[in-house]
A protein has these predicted regions:
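Class I S-adenosyl-L-methionine
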Residues: 1-108, 112, 116
Length: 118
């Protein structure tokens, strides 16, 4: 299973309970290093895949590899994972796999910055 999770605009108070639970249930968490730092208090005992800016494709490929192996994987994005987040890229990469090899995927929406500002 791979879950693509929006963690909100940065503060833990802006993360939805669903996003929090999805991260806690994961055994592997992948994300941009800055976002990993924002949730480091949730990552004890987890395999962490952190990469820098401009390494989104590599990060998603590594996360998908872990999910294919049977791991419960969370890919975190700031804001909402579907709005300038990682959901589109993860889905695009999954479509390149043979259908029988694709792990289940779930998109966990988060609070986008535009909604937080309202």
């Amino acid at each position: 299973m791979i879950k693509v999770i929006g963690i909100g605009p940065g503060g833990k108070e802006d993360m939805t309970p669903r996003a929090l639970n999805a991260i806690l249930e994961a055994d592997t968490v992948a994300g941009y290093n800055t976002y990993i730092k924002l949730i480091k208090h949730l990552l004890d005992g987890k395999n962490v895949i952190g990469t820098g800016m401009m390494q989104e494709v590599d990060r998603c490929k590594m996360a998908i590899e872990e999910a294919v192996k049977g791991h419960n994987v969370a890919v975190v994005s700031s804001g909402d994972s579907g709005v300038y987040g990682m959901a589109g890229l993860v889905l695009e990469l999954l479509l390149k796999l043979p259908k029988e090899e694709r792990p289940q995927v779930q998109i966990v929406a988060g609070l986008s910055a535009v909604n937080a500002a309202a």
